[in-house]
Structure formats: structure tokens, C-alpha cells
């Protein structure tokens, strides 16, 4: 960062890759291009929602509750990780076809120059640019993609369900229907998507340029879900004064429109709905549901519904008709993102070794999301719901630094020093209400939701770096950054982040001069400190009064007014601090045909941020964000790049990477407890979480009960190991068992090139990651109460029937805390297989050949190897709770250079 360096002059753990056009697969966003490509970088896409982003972790996570996302720097502009409604992917601003390279900074000796934003690594994205004196080139990239669901959940059909109901005493099957509805088939579809982009690249004498336009029309495999996205990008690189004054000007615009399906709710409904009833109904009850089958009950006499003829409402305890949910619930969003950065570099006349560098960048994002539920909808029956949410943010980042570089005989020195200032502003507004069909007024003043907020924070930084090389063999890098943040109280605002690294180019030693087959042999050692302030509210260090929610309104006459309440705060908060050590070896031989990189690292984060219980009366509420402990990560990484065969007509290329990481909490001061509850809630237990953080355990470990099994390996209902031998099973018998984080991640890409043909395949693997199988635990009650409760039928699964448990709550809510549901989710996935053909110029115009390109066919997600019983083992938070399925896709594409 803050300058350029040759790869063989780097002292830190840095990986630079260029998107491989032959093996990149289907890439609807930038994060797709990193899956399985970089050692120690775990990329998990956020399901199959059109336009969804990804969770990216570099060498595990450095925090418990603050951000674990890397810092993204796009064409010199650091990007704020806060996302807008309708823009869940912060990299959506970039058309993947515009990306020239990724540079991943992994250790603190490389990232410390970015200070408090770089605890989780840095990903630098550079987009394509024109070159001086380059002729005009027009390029087109387009594709058509057909997507379908890979695998469905195994649930009972109508005949199996009736057989099960009739086998259980206490159930009356007379209210079952005569249909045989496959609810999953009713909500999933085969979708068609298209992607097009055009670029114009050229270079006048002093003005290289590139302009591109792209449009992505993506339709999801869950009905009603789609995304339309347009991107415009322009890069200019003018130079003046005989190349002494150079500019890089980058501007981007993104427009996105989304229709979100309530996929989680629809999938849950499809798995829970009674298969003996149809999707649609006619008759008197159709009035209350819009013609969809729902389980209805008589309206409560105290209901605020003004229409006295509205006699029935949906049973709130019953499963929801998933087709109705998709069609009657409309969530749509529109977002715009503008970003730009201007970099200036002036090489001083007469003293060309001294450069003045300055840049100014900005990003502006705005979005509007509308939520509309029909009057006949399940959740907002009769009244309906109309809501609107608006979000706006803008960020301004400016820096300036001096850089001096000169070679004095055997000494090569480069020094830079400068300052940077960043400002981040965010605001939002939301409101919504239901309306009585007769009176036209809100169903209840206290149920009208309305809120508005605005916030901002600033960061002031001073930075410096020294690069020193002796005899082109011994390298030293030293950097220092000081960050001052507006998020902390006086005396705690500043964080200091030093770093140092050494490298030895062994291949340049005199004793290596006769070993000509070695291209590079370099040893690296690095140390550094970085910080973290994300996850802290902008004014959390000071007491404030904030507006209460809609349920805390107070009536004055006929008008309800919002009240103000004191907010939580902590004036003693300080930075999270991460110290990192790294040792690495780079080796390349045989003119680049064989190479590997190996790295070992250790990093420790102190002053961890987490929300913990506090004694009543000390602060508003009973929870407070505090600096409470420390966490360590250590691991090994290995990356290979081999070309086993290189001939005139045939080439075989293989790249492979593997990373092993272990994390452990080393200190935790969690108030009156020795642990901190964390993670997403499971379906059973009314908000129950089964993950905890505790000293000596990995982050987000599962806290469960040890299941007892019979001689055939079948779990025995209600039987758990009495781990403390006190003769009873209670919370003291729970234990920490596994975690969602993988022990090992791997990536493999192999390519075969024969004349104009190319065939490639990419794989990625995760070993040692465990997932809570929420789908089964939520349905593992095969009894009268489990299948028919609160006057509503619920479907089940063959797996639950085989399990044969009759109750989940009888044993103090222990059954669904069984470690039986925490399953090994290790997997090997084939990311994509691509077959392509590159063709030469098709036409000649004015004696110049035109229209060369490539046609290709790709299969995305063709297969997965895993023992996990759920739909997909790739679950980022470890709770497999009705995610939007990742589809299998088939793509036909064309690249054309005119």
C-alpha cells in the first residue's frame, strides 16, 4: 500500500493474482474470483441470492464481535464496509470484467501501514487501464446462465405423512386434505440470467484511457427473486511536463435494483406445510387469504379489525403457505453508488528522486427499500403493511505524502512520509404501518414504526515507511502509522501501529551464481501491529439520549409521541490491538515452471471488544460493550504453481494452496460469567443460542450436551452423559464441542491448453468445520404434539421419523442441544469446469484483422463431496437455518475483441 514494489522485493506476506479468464468460472461479483485462489483466505459466498456477497476471512478472525472483514482498497480508495439496503455486496460497485488484479496483504508487516483498518488483512483491487500510444480496442463479454437447484430437502409426501399421522395415537386425521403437494417444487424454479459488458480502451500520446459499461440481469432459483445491476467505469491516466506530473483518475457508478424473496421464510414454509393440502383454495375462506390455503382460526372478539364481516384470520402458530409468502410479500430495493479517486504524482524537476504524491477519493451510496405485505397476507392479515427504508452514506478520504528513492552504489533506499484524513457519514430513515380497510387509518398508533438517525466518524492518520536494500540481497522494511479516531474518549483516541520486516534473496548470493535453474529463493521475517475500531458506535464513549422505538410511545390526548431514553455507553473503550509474527519462504525455478510459497504465522489480539452482562444500575440496560480479553491465531500456509507439461501445442498448469489455522481465546473477562453467548439463534427454544466464547476454546464454539447412543449407534432420546456425576442432567453438564471455523482450507485449479482449446477445473475444500443441523432439530419431534400443535399440522422428514424422538422440550430443552445435531461439515466442492475455444481474427478491415475472441461453456457447482446430511455444508455462521440454496449453473459465454 501507498506505493508500488516489485514482487521479488516484497518483505511481507503478500499474494498478487490476476483473474484467470480460462478458469474464473461464473463471476457475478468480485469476491467470486477469490474462491480457493489464495492460501489462508477463506471465501464463503452468502448463499444463492442474486447479487449476494461473501464472507471473506484472512487467516481466521482477529475479533469476537467487531468486524472480521478485510479492508478493501479499490484503485487507491479505501472502502467503508457498511452496506446499504439493497446492496448486500460491498464489491458490487465493480464489474468483474474490469478487474486487472488482486493483491492480498496478509501479515501485519505488510498491513500495518493501513493502521486501525487492517487487523483482518487488506485486499487491494486494481482495475484495468489503457496504455500510452495504444490503439483503440473495443471488447465485449457476454454470457447466458441457466441455474437450477442442486438438492432438495427430504420431507414426507402426502402418503407418507398420512401413514405417520395414522400411526400416532391422539391424532385425528380427518382434517387432512386429499392433495399431494410438493411445496419445494412450488417455490423453486429453473432461472435464466444474462450478463453483458463492453469496454473501450486506448491511449493517446499522454492520455491512456479505458471506459466500460456492464449490465447483469440475474434471476434467482427461488421464485420472485431477481437483481438488475448496471456498472459504468472510467479510468484516465494523463501525464504532463515530460511525464513528471502524472494522474490516475478512476470513476465508477453502480445502479442496482432488487426483488428479494423471503427465501428463509418460504423455505421453512415449504418444509413445514402439510403436504395433503393444495396451494390454492376457493370458497368463502379464500377472501381472508387471497385464494391461498392457510390454516385459519376465528377472529378474536377483541380484534381491532373494523370490518365485522372479516370473520377469520391465519393461525399465527401454523406454518405459512410459502407460495403466498413469495407472492403477497414484496420487498424491493434500489441503490446507487458513486465512487471516484484522483491520484497525483509529481516528480520534482531537477530532483527526480523526490516525488510528491496526493490523492482525494470519495464514495456516495444511497438506497431505498420498500416492504409491502398484502391485506390477505399471513403476517399482516387484513391491515397489510407498507414500509419504506432509506439509507445514505458518503465517505471522503484524502492523503498526501513525500517519497524519496535513490540508489547509492550497493544501497537502495526508499523513504515516504505523509498524512491522511478520512470522514464517514451515514444516515437513514424508516417508517411503516398497516391500514384498516374500512376506516383507512393505522391499525394501532403504537404499531406505527418510524425512525430517523444520522451518525459520522473521522480518522486522522500520520504514516511513514522505509525500504532499504543492500546488494540486491538484503532487504529491510520499517513502517509506522498513528491513527486518531473520533470514536474514543479523550486520552484514548490515538493508536500506534509499527511494523518491521527482513528478507534475504538467497538466490542473489555469490555462492548461488552457478545454480542457474533457481529463479528465486527468498526468506522473509516480519512483525507488526494493527488495530480495530469497527463494531463500536460512533458516540458510544459518551452518554446520550436517543429516541425510543414505536412500542415506547406515550399518548397525549389522541396523539402518540415518541419518548427519549438514555443510551448505553462506555467511556473507557479503547482499540483492539493485533500483533502478528510471520516467517516465509518464496521459491521459483525452471523459468517459472515450478514455484511455491510457504508461510508460518502467529498473531494475538488484545483488548477484544464484546458485549457482556453488567450489574444492574451501572449503565442503562444490562449489557455493555467492553474490552474484555485476548485471542490468538496461528497457522501454516503453502501454495504451489506447477507447469508439469509445456510443449508447442500442449500445456498443463496446476495451482494448489492449503492453509491450516487454529484460533483460541486466551483471556476473557465476561462480567459475572466466564463465557459470552454468541451466534445466531436456532429455530427451537425461542431465541436459544448454542454458541459460546470461553477461555481455552475456539471462537463461537458450540455449547451442547453429550449424546448417549445405543449399541447400533442410534441416539437415545433424553439420554446424555452426566459429565459432573451429580446424578442429574442440567446446564452444568454442557460442554464445548467443535466450532464453525475450518481447521484446513484448500484450493486447486488445473488447466489444460491444446492449441486453441482450453479445459479447466477449480476446486475448493474445507476440513474440520462443524455445522448445527437446524433443519433436523426443528423437526425431530415425532409425536402428537410435534405434528399437530396449536391447531396446526406440521410436516416432518424421514430422518426424523427414523430418529423417533417424541419430545424436544420435555427434558428441559436439552434434546435440541444434543451434540448429535452438531455435524462434521467438511467438504470438497468443484467450483467450476470450463471448456473454451479461442479463435483468431474473423474479418479484415483496412488490412487490419478484427474480431478475435473466445467462446466457452462453464458448469458451476457441478458436485460436492461431503458427509454432512444437510442441503449445503458451506454455512458461514455454523447454524444451518433455511439458507437460500446455491444453485448449479450452466453458462455459455463469448469474449470478443473488435
Describe the residue ranges of each PLM region:
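Extracytoplasmic gating/loop element in the C-terminal half of outer-membrane beta-barrel translocons
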Residues: 171-174, 184, 317, 323, ...
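Short, small/polar-rich motifs associated with maturation and membrane association
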Residues: 1-255, 262, 310-312, 339, ...
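Short aromatic-centered micro-motifs
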Residues: 72, 468, 708, 723, ...
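Extracellular/periplasmic, surface-exposed regions of secreted and cell-surface proteins
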Residues: 21-22, 69, 162-163, 169, ...
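Conserved small-residue
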Residues: 139-177, 263, 270, 626, ...
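Glycine-rich, aromatic-lined ligand/substrate-binding cores of catalytic
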Residues: 739-772
